[in-house]
């Protein structure tokens, strides 16, 4: 019995130390596990935030793509609608509203329709001139050249038809020359070129002419000059008549009697402005007749060269306008 107690005591102390060691190790393990869990939790939160941000960015990207596709579709529909309106304008001589429920030929719409038509006409003319130039360079026969020359004259007839329709809706747009380049506007006369100046250009480019051709061209130039002078005088008279009409009566008074007089003056002035369309039409007829007379007086090959000379002169005016607009400004 005496030997039993000490052994029991030693065993208890050993167990206690062992338990304490296990407790310490367990405590340390729990602490390390908590720290690892917190670190892992922080990483999980960052990952979740990053995933959420990626999802939001993807959602916004899809929305932007959807909006872009919708914008493209809207632009396509508007372009189709505009093409349909212009087609109706060509057929009817008016510009149709996008709603389609009523026709109108307001000044702004008429001018826009004409500008589109004129650009298309110019593109077609450029193609004709390239074809004509190529035919001349390749020494095409007179019969082949005649077909192209007649096509160019017919194309000018189409231009004056387009201008006639435009004059009905906005004659001032044609008179102002805003559909031309700045340099071209410097030489503008009643919505176009002067026939007499055109003939001077042609005569200088086609020398030598026969004696009879020179005489005929000179006579045509003189008759064109006389017609231009008559139209210019008519425009001067119209401007003076408009000024007299608008300045007649008492200015600045607002009595009922003067209001009636004012409305009467406006009605008279509107009637006189209506004659502007006639001036444009006569000037364009003169221009067309000049082309037609020119090709009758010249040989087929001379006519082809004359049409090219006029076209190249116009191209140089446009090039001059581009250089002028692009010049350095101090």
Curated annotation (Swiss-Prot):
Belongs to the bZIP family. Residues 1-13 have a biased composition (Polar residues). Pfam families: bZIP_1, DOG1. Binds DNA as a dimer. Interaction with the Dof domain protein OBP1 enhances the binding to the ocs element. Interacts with NPR1, NPR3 and NPR4. Residues 111-327 form the DOG1 domain. GO terms for cellular component: nucleus. Residues 72-86 are annotated as: Leucine-zipper. It is found in: Nucleus. Residues 1-64 are annotated as: Disordered. GO terms for biological process: defense response to other organism; DNA-templated transcription; response to xenobiotic stimulus; salicylic acid mediated signaling pathway. This is Transcription factor TGA5. It comes from the Eukaryota. The keyword Nucleotide-binding does not apply. It comes from Arabidopsis thaliana. The keyword Metal-binding does not apply. The lineage of its organism: Eukaryota, Viridiplantae, Streptophyta, Embryophyta, Tracheophyta. GO terms for molecular function: DNA binding; DNA-binding transcription factor activity; identical protein binding; transcription cis-regulatory region binding. PROSITE patterns: BZIP, BZIP_BASIC, DOG1. Keywords: Activator, Coiled coil, DNA-binding, Nucleus, Transcription, Transcription regulation. InterPro entries: bZIP, bZIP_sf, TGA_domain. Residues 44-107 form the bZIP domain.
């Amino acid at each position: 019995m005496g030997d039993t107690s000490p052994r029991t005591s030693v065993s208890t102390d050993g167990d206690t130390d062992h338990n304490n060691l296990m407790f310490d190790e367990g405590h340390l393990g729990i602490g390390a596990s908590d720290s690892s869990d917190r670190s892992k939790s922080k990483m999980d939160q960052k990952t979740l935030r990053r995933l959420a941000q990626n999802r939001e960015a993807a959602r916004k990207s899809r929305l932007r793509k959807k909006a872009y596709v919708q914008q493209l579709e809207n632009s396509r529909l508007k372009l189709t609608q505009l093409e349909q309106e212009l087609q109706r304008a060509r057929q009817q001589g008016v510009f149709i509203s996008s709603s389609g429920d009523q026709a109108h030929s307001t000044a702004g719409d008429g001018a826009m329709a004409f500008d589109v038509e004129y650009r298309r006409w110019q593109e077609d003319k450029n193609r004709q001139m390239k074809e004509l130039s190529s035919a001349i360079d390749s020494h095409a026969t007179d019969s082949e050249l005649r077909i192209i020359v007649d096509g160019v004259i017919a194309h000018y007839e189409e231009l004056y038809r387009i201008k006639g329709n435009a004059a009905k809706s906005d004659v001032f747009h044609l008179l102002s020359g805003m559909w031309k380049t700045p340099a071209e506007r410097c030489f503008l006369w009643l919505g176009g070129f002067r026939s007499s100046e055109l003939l001077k250009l042609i005569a200088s480019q086609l020398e030598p002419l026969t004696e009879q051709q020179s005489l005929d061209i000179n006579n045509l130039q003189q008759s064109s000059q006389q017609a231009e002078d008559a139209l210019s005088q008519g425009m001067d008279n119209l401007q003076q008549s408009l000024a007299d009409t608008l300045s007649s009566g008492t200015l600045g008074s607002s009595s009922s009697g003067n209001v009636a007089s004012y409305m009467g003056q406006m009605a008279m002035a509107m009637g006189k402005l209506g004659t502007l369309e006639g001036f444009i039409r006569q000037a364009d007829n003169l221009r067309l007749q000049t082309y037609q007379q020119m090709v009758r007086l010249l040989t087929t090959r001379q006519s082809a060269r004359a049409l090219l000379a006029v076209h190249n002169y116009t191209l140089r005016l446009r090039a001059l306008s581009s250089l002028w607009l692009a010049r350095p400004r101090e």
